[in-house]
């Protein structure tokens, strides 16, 4: 059995505005193993995106904790969380969030620049990842010169350029047509096999979720069931 990479222990998240309290997450507990491909399925507003923000250290739970590689995030400073996000975690969103004035190569290189890698390593590694997603021939093109599917591939290359242990993906194909969505999920599976990267994908699409090795369902801020979707139509 693979080692547990990330563990959630009774995560709760509450927002308060004046006298109004809104509970978004209720005692969420689960784990992700090294190299695992997992989906969390739920409708819009079910708490999936809030959960990803907590897992990535972008927000703080009201109670409970996230443990990454045996280390509680609650014990980490802001600087240590930022380093964790840069070195050990990758993020993919529904919208690519590429910098419009930078080329594909420069966008992919950004996490390496932030991590203060050597210039020669930055260029070679960024180009290597563009090649891995089939876009090395588009390295010098800006986002406006790329198709929607190509832009998302660049975003995936950027998420994986630092060899993260885990990639958190929030509706990564939600802005793509069926053909490009299928291509992106095939790419994630290939990168998982080649690099051993674990993926946690949140989505409302059961057809996409079934491609993952494990699926959990979220409703109203609660994990309600472990689904069996393999081969579902």
UniProtKB/Swiss-Prot annotation:
The complex is composed of two ATP-binding proteins (LolD) and two transmembrane proteins (LolC and LolE). Gene3D superfamilies: P-loop containing nucleotide triphosphate hydrolases (3.40.50.300). It is a peripheral membrane protein. PROSITE patterns: ABC_TRANSPORTER_1, ABC_TRANSPORTER_2, LOLD. InterPro entries: AAA+_ATPase (IPR003593), ABC_transporter-like_ATP-bd (IPR003439), ABC_transporter-like_CS (IPR017871), ABC_transpr_LolD-like (IPR015854), LolD_lipo_ATP-bd (IPR011924), MacB-like_ATP-bd (IPR017911), P-loop_NTPase (IPR027417). It is an enzyme of class 7 (translocase). Its EC number is 7.6.2.-. GO terms for molecular function: ATP binding; ATP hydrolysis activity; transmembrane transporter activity. Residues 6-233 form the ABC transporter domain. ATP binds at residues 42-49. One of its GO terms (biological process) is lipoprotein localization to outer membrane. The gene is lolD. It is found in: Cell inner membrane. Part of the ABC transporter complex LolCDE involved in the translocation of mature outer membrane-directed lipoproteins, from the inner membrane to the periplasmic chaperone, LolA. Responsible for the formation of the LolA-lipoprotein complex in an ATP-dependent manner. Keywords: ATP-binding, Cell inner membrane, Cell membrane, Membrane, Nucleotide-binding, Translocase, Transport. GO terms for cellular component: plasma membrane. Belongs to the ABC transporter superfamily. Lipoprotein translocase (TC 3.A.1.125) family. It comes from Shigella dysenteriae serotype 1 (strain Sd197). NCBIfam families: LolD_lipo_ex (TIGR02211), PRK11629.1 (NF008639). This is Lipoprotein-releasing system ATP-binding protein LolD.
């Amino acid at each position: 059995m693979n080692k547990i990479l990330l563990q959630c222990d009774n995560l709760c998240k509450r927002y308060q505005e004046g006298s109004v309290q809104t509970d978004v997450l209720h005692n969420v507990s689960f784990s992700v193993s090294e190299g695992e491909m997992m989906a969390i399925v739920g409708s819009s507003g079910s708490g999936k995106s809030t959960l990803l923000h907590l897992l990535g250290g972008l927000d703080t739970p009201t109670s409970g904790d996230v443990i990454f590689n045996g280390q509680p995030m609650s014990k980490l400073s802001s600087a240590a969380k930022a380093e964790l996000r840069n070195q050990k975690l990758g993020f993919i969103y529904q919208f690519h969030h590429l910098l419009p004035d930078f080329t594909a190569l420069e966008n992919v290189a950004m996490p390496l620049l932030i991590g203060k890698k050597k210039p020669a390593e930055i260029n070679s590694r960024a180009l290597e990842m563009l090649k891995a997603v089939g876009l090395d021939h588009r390295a010098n093109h800006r986002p406006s010169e790329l198709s929607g599917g190509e832009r998302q591939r660049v975003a995936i290359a950027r998420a994986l350029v630092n060899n993260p242990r885990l990639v958190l993906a929030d509706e990564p194909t939600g802005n793509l047509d069926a053909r490009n969505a299928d291509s992106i999920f095939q790419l994630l599976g290939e990168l998982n096999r080649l690099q051993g990267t674990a993926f946690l994908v949140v989505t409302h699409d059961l057809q996409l979720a079934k491609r993952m090795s494990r699926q959990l369902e979220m409703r109203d801020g609660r994990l309600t069931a472990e689904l069996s979707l393999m081969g579902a139509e």
